[in-house]
Amino acid sequence: MRRELLLEKIETYKAIMPWYVLDYYQSKLAVPYSFTTLYEYLKEYKRFFDWLMDADLTQAPKIADIDLSTLEHLTKKDLEAFVLYLRERPSLNTYSTKEGLSQTTINRTLSALSSLYKYLTEEVENDQGEPYFYRNVMKKVSTKKKKETLASRAENIKQKLFLGDETLAFLDYVDKEYEQKLSNRAKSSFRKNKERDLAIIALLLASGVRLSEAVNLDLKDVNLNMMIIEVIRKGGKRDSVNVAGFAKGYLESYLAVRQRRYKAEKQDLAFFLTEYRGVPNRMDASSIEKMVGKYSEDFKIRVTPHKLRHTLATRLYDATKSQVLVSHQLGHSSTQVTDLYTHIVNDEQKTALDNL
């Protein structure tokens, strides 16, 4: 979603929210949470507040009038009823016959509510320096995790990674072969953004940064002499990320055309730009997802930017056998998250042995 459209949608949701949600929004913006995260959270709050009114758990005539007392006095049974509603409600997607939301979506809804309740009961201060209330009912609501062993997950993910020589082969394919099958009109569009698209793919494969971190990258955050970029990690922490050397040429080629091709001025801070009717804008997450999907599908299999992150992590673990190093590269505080890559690499080693 384009940044301008995203901000418009955020303002639409803010206009109907209670004052304490607006306080929450302002507080998290200062962390900073990304606009995309805050937008998703606001959507979840609307879903929840709509249900409160439909279930007669508030007498408020509209969402903005739902008071803190309502949230304070909700019971565990009330929240469990909300979860059941999410699980059993007819799907709003007319193309799907499945009823109810997926467990992943339900977990996301509960995560958003947990964040709001934590803010209201622990983080915010009233005039007396106390939180708005103390009872956090969300601490009593458990979420159901998807049951899958690491070995099973590794097997599912492995097919969507560009390991070994495939990392550079993918970049080489986009650079030299992709356009050969395009029409003349399509070639013109491809060539306009070729350097930028290659730079994005190379950066994701060479650093393992999250999609949001790549989107929010500014020109000042990129040091090609040191091959280091500065990103804002989850939770608002600033981090320096090393970038593998194979990405340097692609990034330099993009920088050489960035200003001229995208009409960039001094005030255009975003590193990755798109241009529409002569106006440069920060490239958004949706556009990058579509771009990566388009090229990867033509090369081998359609993947997301997150799979390119998995690719870097797996290759780095294979080269170093250090979960600590991989955790630091990905911006994780624990090595537990990187257990997945040990399973992928071990499976690759077994395959190699079987071929001896």
UniProtKB/Swiss-Prot annotation:
The active site is at residues 210, 234, 306, 309, 332, 341. The keyword DNA-binding applies. Transmembrane segments: none annotated. FtsK is required for recombination. GO terms for cellular component: cytoplasm. One of its GO terms (biological process) is DNA recombination. Residues 16-121 form the Core-binding (CB) domain. InterPro entries: CB, DNA_brk_join_enz, Integrase-like_cat_sf, Integrase_catalytic, Integrase_recombinase_N, Integrase_SAM-like_N, Recomb_XerS, Tyrosine_recombinase_XerCD. It is found in: Cytoplasm. Coiled coil: none annotated. GO terms for molecular function: DNA binding; tyrosine-based site-specific recombinase activity. Keywords: Cell cycle, Cell division, Chromosome partition, Cytoplasm, DNA integration, DNA recombination, DNA-binding. Its main location: cytoplasm. Pfam families: Phage_int_SAM_1 (PF02899), Phage_integrase (PF00589). Residues 169-354 form the Tyr recombinase domain. Belongs to the 'phage' integrase family. XerS subfamily. Site-specific tyrosine recombinase, which acts by catalyzing the cutting and rejoining of the recombining DNA molecules. Essential to convert dimers of the bacterial chromosome into monomers to permit their segregation at cell division. NCBIfam families: PRK05084.1. This is Tyrosine recombinase XerS. It comes from Streptococcus pyogenes serotype M12 (strain MGAS9429). The gene is xerS.
